[in-house]
Amino acid sequence: MSKSLFITFEGTEGCGKSTQIELLAKTLRVLGYPVHTLREPGGTPVGEEVRHTLKHSKTNVAMTPEAELLLVNASRAQLVREVIRPALAVGEVVLCDRFYDSTTAYQGYGRGLDLALVKSVIDFAVGNTRPDLTLFLHVPPEVSAERLLSRQSILPFIRDRMEEGDRHFFARVAKGYEAIAAAEPDRVRVVDGAGTIEVVCAKIWEYVQPVLPRVGRW
């Protein structure tokens, strides 16, 4: 099998994941690495339909935590088999905006579903496809809330169900991420996401650079 690298980005809403993925992808491509960027839920035609249902559909108001868990992992199962595994098989660097740690944090800690049940569903969806490195962009709740308000003021007509939780919900999600990072320190690296874009980018590079030798360049 070709050398490859699977990096996931995690964090609460407004932590800056999408911006940092774009910057890292650009840097890696300039250096000659084959890069594939993805997002969850989504990344495939099936996954994008699920994403719309989970986040923006008018019909999701009464969605239960159990349904949310299954839909997220249906999208993930498709993404793993249709995109992630093939990309890794040919030696690409895969950068994914969220992966299964989001499910543990949001549906497990946030929604209060049994963590053992959540893990079993995740395991079924991803099999042995696991990230080599996870970057958890940690921001204080007040920073996250401020960034969300700013984003919503720019896009006021786009409803996102996953941004509608109260502060207690997002506090539980943050606690979930902290627990994950504490349990797997070799895989999960905590990055202070409250700094400037440039400072956060530099810190991410400190964690990414040591794992790059395992990947071939073009």
PLM segments and residue spans:
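Conserved phosphate-donor/acceptor-positioning beta-strand/loop module used by diverse small-molecule
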Residues: 96-98, 127-148
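NTP-dependent small-molecule kinase module
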Residues: 25, 142-218
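Pre-Walker A (Motif I) flank of P-loop NTPase domains
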Residues: 2-6
